[in-house]
């Protein structure tokens, strides 16, 4: 991300750009809430979206309609993807990471995260991230809240950050694996 000249931006331009980014995050919220089959997301709005800094993963803006509890943790999810991509060395336009590991930028296993790098003119511009509460992700009991569980793996399917899509092509192995546990 090119940051040269950023201190020269005038307050009006800054306000317009900030408002546009907020609108993008709000539209991400509205799109998921309208399209969701899951009533926890569609009705209770147990989800959130935002735009995150391309280098640091820090929160730039977050949608107004999602749950505010995710504001504090979503940047950790994005940072986990940045670290994973740096380790693997293969971040590309159209990649989408999915995961629910609560120890890596999360809240609990029912909150599934999607993180996508967004490129502008061939350069990484920011990350788009979404989190939403899923009814069931393969735990021993419906809803994943098992008071008899003695470790996290008895609560639900733990998915580390993996590519759901690679350069815009769906990774059907991840979809098939996930369907096998829920």
Where are these regions (language model features)?
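Alpha-helix capping and helix-loop boundary segments enriched in small/acidic/polar residues
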Residues: 12, 65-72, 85, 105-110, ...
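Solvent-exposed alpha-helices and their adjacent loops that cap or buttress functional pockets
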Residues: 41-44, 88-91, 107-109, 121, ...
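Long, charge-dense accessory insertions within large macromolecular proteins
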Residues: 3-78, 180
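A charged amphipathic helix-loop-strand protein-protein interaction module that recurs
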Residues: 25, 68-101
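Generic recognition of flexible, low-complexity loop/linker segments
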Residues: 35-39, 48, 86-87, 102-105, ...
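Mobile "lid/hinge" segments at catalytic clefts and subdomain interfaces of large enzymes
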Residues: 121-182
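Sensory/regulatory domains in signal-transduction proteins
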Residues: 95-136, 150
């Amino acid at each position: 991300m090119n940051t040269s000249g950023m201190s020269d931006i005038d307050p009006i331009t800054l306000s317009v750009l900030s408002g546009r980014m907020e609108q993008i995050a709000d539209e991400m919220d509205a799109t998921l809430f309208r399209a969701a089959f899951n009533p926890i997301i569609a009705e209770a709005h147990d989800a959130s979206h935002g735009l995150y800094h391309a280098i640091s993963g820090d929160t730039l803006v977050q949608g107004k309609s999602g749950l505010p509890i995710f504001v504090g943790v979503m940047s950790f999810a994005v940072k986990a993807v940045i670290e994973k991509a740096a380790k693997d060395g293969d971040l590309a336009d159209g990649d989408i990471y999915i995961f629910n590991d609560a120890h890596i930028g999360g809240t609990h296993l029912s909150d599934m995260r999607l993180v996508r790098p967004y490129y502008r003119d061939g350069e990484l511009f920011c990350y788009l991230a979404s989190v939403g509460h899923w009814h069931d992700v393969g735990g021993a009991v419906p809803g994943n809240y098992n008071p008899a569980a003695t470790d996290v793996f008895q609560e639900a399917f733990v998915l580390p950050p993996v590519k759901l899509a690679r350069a815009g092509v769906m990774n059907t192995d991840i979809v098939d694996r996930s369907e096998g546990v829920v």
